[in-house]
Structures are given as C-alpha cells and as structure tokens.
Design a protein with these regions (language model features):
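Acidic, low-complexity intrinsically disordered regions
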Residues: 1-216
Length: 216
C-alpha cells in the first residue's frame, strides 16, 4: 500500500548495561553528533530512544527529531544486566500500537529500528527470542519496517538472524572508544537513505565491519 507521507519513524535501542562502563562519554558524544547531523537534513521524522539494562526506560517517545535535546550523563548511565529481547519486544509493541490507531495518512512511510548491544541477552522475562522473531518478521513483511543490529562480544550476524533480522542488516563492532565512534559515524547513512525515500544499502555497515576486522 502506498503511503501518504514521507515521515520516518526512528527507534534507537541502546545498551546501557554494566558492561558498557567506561564508554559513557563516547556513547553520549556519538549519539549527540548523529542527532545534530540528522537535524540538518530534510524530511519529517519522529524519534524514540530506548535504553536498556535489566529493564527498559524510554528517554524519547516519538519526539519530532528537531526537538530531541542533547543526551547528558544524567540520561545515560550504565548499570545492570542485558534484557535485550524485552527492550526490542516492548518497543515493537509500542510503535506498532501507535501506527495501528492513528489515521492511515499519519502512519509513517518508513520505520527504522537501530539496535546496539555489547553482550548476550541474559535478563529477559517478558518475551522469548522466538516471540520477538515473529514480531520482527511480521513488521518487516506486512509493513516494510527495517531493523539494523550492531553487536559487540557476540556473533552479531547470527544473533540478529535468530531474531529474524537479515544478515546484511547486522554487523559486529568493537565496544571501545574507537569502535563506538565508527558506529555513530556510520549509522547516519542508512537513516538519511530512509528519510530520502531510498533503500538502505547492503553495505551500510562496511565501515564498522572493516574496523572490527582490522582490530580483531
């Protein structure tokens, strides 16, 4: 079905579990730089930011992109375990319900989830991996949602595949200062592509993968 607008729904699911300790300033700086760059681009966009450890908290809930404030150390502090599956499941459920009940002409033409984690799921209690996989596959097939998965200290490609995310939409990264910088520099391109009504390149994560392989 042809959409009646060129609105982009952006959903960032960011790991803030204890293993991210020491990368707080890099994460905050990279996030803010990416947002400021996107504010200069054309196209209407709503943005949600979900932070997760052993539980999820919503930092931004579908705010217009140009109204996203800078992230601070008060917003992003690390703690706890890694309830990745629950964070993804909650976010899909929330955004899906909003799209279900708004006027058809107001449903964003494009929806992009960007998921970053530096470890294996170890604290889910709401959703199973199989349930989230079915949710992701449904949103992809029925509504054309896109999902990018960026993981450290795990096999990101295999983990993404277990969630129903295509292998060419997943990439491994190093959870250190340099790797975090490369991550945020790289993800601007697929965001921009969606906002311009273009397809995300299958090589969107090449710079991240190159850094990972170079320092493996």
């Amino acid at each position: 079905m042809k959409k009646e607008n060129n609105i982009t729904e952006l959903v960032f699911i960011l790991d803030r579990s204890g293993s991210m300790s020491g990368l707080e300033s890099d994460t905050i700086g990279g996030f803010n730089t990416k947002i400021e760059k996107q504010k200069k681009e054309d196209g209407e966009a709503y943005m949600s930011t979900v932070l997760f450890d052993n539980e999820s908290s919503v930092l931004h809930d579908r705010l217009p992109l140009d109204r996203i404030p800078k992230m601070t150390a008060r917003d992003y502090s690390v703690r706890g375990c890694t309830a990745l599956v629950d964070a993804i499941g909650d976010a899909i459920h929330h955004i899906g319900n909003i799209h279900k009940y708004v006027r058809p002409k107001d449903v964003p033409a494009h929806t992009l989830f960007i998921i970053t984690t530096d470890g294996q799921e170890n604290a889910n209690y709401k959703y199973s991996s199989d349930t989230v996989k079915k949710m992701i596959e449904r949103q992809k097939e029925k509504y054309g949602w896109e999902f990018l998965f960026i993981g450290a200290n795990i096999d990101a490609v295999e983990t993404a595949a277990s969630f129903g995310i295509a292998r060419n939409r997943a990439v491994n990264y190093h959870a250190d200062s340099e790797g975090t910088q490369v991550l945020y520099e790289t993800i601007s391109a697929p965001i921009s592509a969606m906002r311009k009504n273009q397809a995300i390149s299958n090589t969107w994560g090449a710079q991240i993968e190159e850094d990972f392989q170079k320092r493996k």
